[in-house]
């Protein structure tokens, strides 16, 4: 039986690849169904012999308890946005300062969910959401139900690939029809539907909803020398790669492609929200490098957002965690990009003055980045009142005087005891990108704050289970989960805590870079500003902000209290040792190592202060080679780069 099951699995997986990836099936649907039913019958009779890559795994049946956190071996960066031809020209100019004659590759920006797929010896072992770029959620069982994701590869590879998981428009219509018939609320758009589907705990639901993918990158170090060759390699491995792409030599060619795609956009079977432009050559990508948040070798052009008219009814003013007071417009409801919009940001007081927005105005509303509703401009021909908006002079939360600094566009409350700032700071501290305390969302934080149970972030770690039971709507099971989530967050690596403290200009990526260098928040608090500013990708603004924060009254007390409650202040990732043997050097690993695993070699190099990259360029300082090193060794020799072997690395 085992032999026949092997034959059926191999056949069915090949036929599935022909159907979903190549769009060139060699057998009829009825023949595929016949073989599939035969396999199901055999697996039912011999369950102990079911193969890991059997296509029957794509059918639901598992109900998951939840999704575990998963640390990405290769971080997922966001992309810099561009909204005009001028911004693309500026991107091109920046690239040409480093790369004389770049070739670009243009790909469609799929409006879906970013995923990372990891294979070991050719078998899918992990499917993970993007999350914050460093930590995502393990949704492997759900992604196994996406029919065009290969469960096994034709080669026994260790590889991590990235792509977008989306819901085709036809599937979206079918899903919403079923929900309507069942009296359930319909999804606003295919992206929301895909996101909701991938977070289903019942994998049978995922299997029914016909999600699809486009893969676009090999995340693990690639032996290909260009993005285009990388995409073709992904196709060879059985992944679906979007065929709508071009190579371009200049922005004129890119702009023509963007216009062409814009005209075809509505006729595509899936949603897109732009075009991604990348430098095609991978060595050039290495030379250009990254900012704290995004690669310097890529940009995402976003199509102009849909616009609608709405009437301004009133304005609410709210205080954020940094004291900035933001105006939000209350509007007559309009349908915009698949959702009903009745509130939109007015950004700040300078924006209101610049756009001359007045009471009862008719305004144009759009979604900035296709996400955040915002007021774009006034329809002056429909103005009914000359009365200007009321601009507050006092904080809506604490009634302190508001300040409007010359170098800022917003009103600001500088009262450190402002209740709104404290509460927003607590919400930020517990959020996913910060301490990631599951269940401790805005509503619970607001109740805790109102009950005077928390007044700063250290108080969160003094809470007991019974404290949550004092809150309306919180039962014993929820209280236990909240308490457990808080205790678990104490073990987070310190970059999560640093970001959670809400220090101005210090985002999640900067927090990680800082802790990699200084190893602990205590070390960072004592660091010299010049040393902070010298760290690559950071600078004087962040250094000054950190100095101001740690010098402020109460910061030392807060850190001491956090430490006393058991919160970890040390970095748990791979640190950078300032005086290590390879400190500051860019190193490439190539060839087959005899004694060390590649991951072990990479970790050792990083522990010695090196930055390990996948391609040899003029910025490479050292190449460590094993057997069959190939083109990377040749490139290193051509550039006169120092070459070392495995024995040398072991001796360090």
From Swiss-Prot:
Full protein name: DNA ligase
Recorded superkingdom: Bacteria
GO molecular function, one term: DNA binding
Catalytic residues in the record: 109 (n6-amp-lysine intermediate)
Matches recorded under NCBIfam families: dnlj, PRK07956.1
Keywords: DNA damage, DNA repair, DNA replication, Ligase, Magnesium, Manganese, Metal-binding, NAD, Zinc
InterPro entries, A to Z: BRCT_dom (IPR001357), BRCT_dom_sf (IPR036420), DisA/LigA_HHH (IPR041663), DNA_ligase (IPR001679), DNA_ligase_AS (IPR018239), DNA_ligase_CS (IPR033136), DNAligase_adenylation (IPR013839), DNAligase_N (IPR013840)
EC numbers on record: 6.5.1.2
SMART domains xrefs: BRCT, HhH1, LIGANc
GO CC aspect terms: cytosol
Family membership: Belongs to the NAD-dependent DNA ligase family. LigA subfamily.
PROSITE patterns assigned: BRCT, DNA_LIGASE_N1, DNA_LIGASE_N2
Pfam families noted in UniProt: BRCT, DNA_ligase_aden, DNA_ligase_OB, DNA_ligase_ZBD, HHH_2, HHH_5
Reaction catalyzed: NAD(+) + (deoxyribonucleotide)n-3'-hydroxyl + 5'-phospho-(deoxyribonucleotide)m = (deoxyribonucleotide)n+m + AMP + beta-nicotinamide D-nucleotide
GO biological process: DNA repair; DNA replication
Cofactor(s) listed in the protein's UniProt record: Mg(2+); Mn(2+)
Function description: DNA ligase that catalyzes the formation of phosphodiester linkages between 5'-phosphoryl and 3'-hydroxyl groups in double-stranded DNA using NAD as a coenzyme and as the energy source for the reaction. It is essential for DNA replication and repair of damaged DNA.
BRCT domain residues: 577-652
PANTHER family assigned: CHROMOSOME TRANSMISSION FIDELITY FACTOR 18, DNA LIGASE
Binding-site list for Zn(2+): 395, 398, 413, 418
Binding site for NAD(+): 29-33, 78-79, 107, 130, 164, 278, 302
């Amino acid at each position: 039986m085992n032999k026949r099951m092997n034959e059926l699995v191999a056949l069915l997986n090949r036929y599935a690849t022909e159907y979903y990836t190549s769009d060139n099936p060699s057998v009829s649907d009825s023949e595929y169904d016949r073989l599939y039913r035969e396999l199901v019958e055999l697996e039912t009779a011999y369950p102990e012999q079911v193969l890991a890559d059997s296509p029957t795994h794509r059918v639901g049946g598992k109900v998951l308890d939840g999704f575990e956190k998963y640390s990405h071996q290769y971080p997922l960066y966001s992309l810099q946005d561009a909204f005009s031809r001028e911004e693309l020209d500026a991107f091109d100019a920046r690239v040409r300062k480093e790369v004389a004659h770049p070739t670009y590759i243009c790909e469609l920006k799929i409006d879906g969910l970013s995923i990372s797929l990891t294979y070991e010896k050719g078998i899918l072992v992990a499917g993970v959401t993007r999350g914050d770029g460093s930590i995502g959620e393990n949704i492997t069982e759900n992604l196994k139900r996406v029919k065009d994701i290969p469960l096994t590869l034709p080669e026994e590879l260790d590889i991590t690939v990235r792509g977008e998981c989306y819901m085709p428009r036809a599937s979206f219509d079918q899903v919403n029809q079923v929900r309507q018939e069942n009296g359930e609320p319909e999804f606003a758009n295919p992206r929301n539907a895909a996101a909701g589907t991938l977070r289903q705990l019942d994998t049978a639901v995922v299997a029914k909803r016909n999600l699809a993918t486009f893969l676009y990158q090999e995340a693990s170090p690639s032996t290909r020398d260009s993005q285009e060759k990388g995409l073709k390699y992904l196709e060879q491995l059985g992944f679906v790669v979007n065929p709508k792409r071009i190579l371009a030599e200049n922005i004129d060619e890119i702009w023509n492609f963007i216009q062409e795609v814009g005209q075809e956009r509505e006729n595509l079977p899936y949603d897109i929200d732009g075009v991604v432009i990348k430098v095609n050559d991978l060595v050039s990508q290495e030379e250009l490098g990254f900012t704290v948040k995004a690669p310097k070798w890529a940009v995402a052009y976003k199509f102009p957002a849909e616009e609608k008219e709405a009437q301004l009814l009133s304005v609410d003013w709210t205080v954020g965690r940094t004291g900035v007071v933001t105006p939000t417009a209350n509007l007559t409801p309009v349908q915009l990009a698949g959702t009903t919009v009745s509130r939109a940001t007015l950004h700040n007081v300078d924006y209101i003055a610049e756009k001359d927005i007045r009471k009862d105005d008719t305004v144009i509303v759009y979604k900035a980045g296709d996400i955040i509703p915002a007021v774009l401009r006034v329809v002056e021909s429909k103005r009914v009142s000359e009365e200007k908006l009321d601009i507050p002079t006092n904080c809506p939360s604490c009634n302190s005087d508001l300040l409007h600094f010359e170098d800022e566009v917003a009103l600001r409350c500088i009262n450190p005891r402002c209740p709104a700032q404290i509460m927003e700071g607590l919400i930020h501290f517990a959020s996913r990108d910060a301490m990631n305390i599951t269940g401790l969302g805005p509503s619970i934080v607001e109740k805790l704050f109102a009950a005077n149970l928390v007044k700063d972030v250290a108080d969160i770690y003094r809470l007991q289970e019974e404290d949550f039971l004092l809150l309306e709507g919180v039962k014993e099971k929820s209280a236990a989960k909240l308490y457990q989530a808080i205790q678990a967050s104490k073990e987070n690596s310190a970059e999560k805590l640093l970001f959670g403290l809400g220090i101005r200009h210090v985002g999640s990526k900067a927090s990680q870079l800082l802790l990699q260098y200084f190893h602990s928040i205590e070390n960072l608090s004592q660091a010299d500003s010049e040393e902070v500013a010298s760290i690559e990708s950071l600078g004087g603004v962040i250094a000054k902000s950190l100095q101001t924060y740690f010098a402020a009254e109460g910061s030392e007390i807060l850190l001491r209290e956090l430490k006393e409650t058991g919160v970890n202040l040390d970095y748990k990732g791979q640190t950078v040792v300032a005086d290590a043997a390879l400190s500051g050097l860019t190193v490439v690993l190539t060839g087959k190592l005899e004694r060390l695993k590649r991951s072990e070699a990479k970790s050792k190099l990083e522990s010695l202060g090196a930055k390990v990259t996948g391609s040899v360029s003029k910025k490479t300082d050292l190449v460590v080679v094993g057997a069959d090193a190939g083109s990377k060794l040749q490139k290193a020799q051509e550039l006169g780069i120092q070459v070392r072997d495995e024995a040398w690395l072991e001796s360090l």
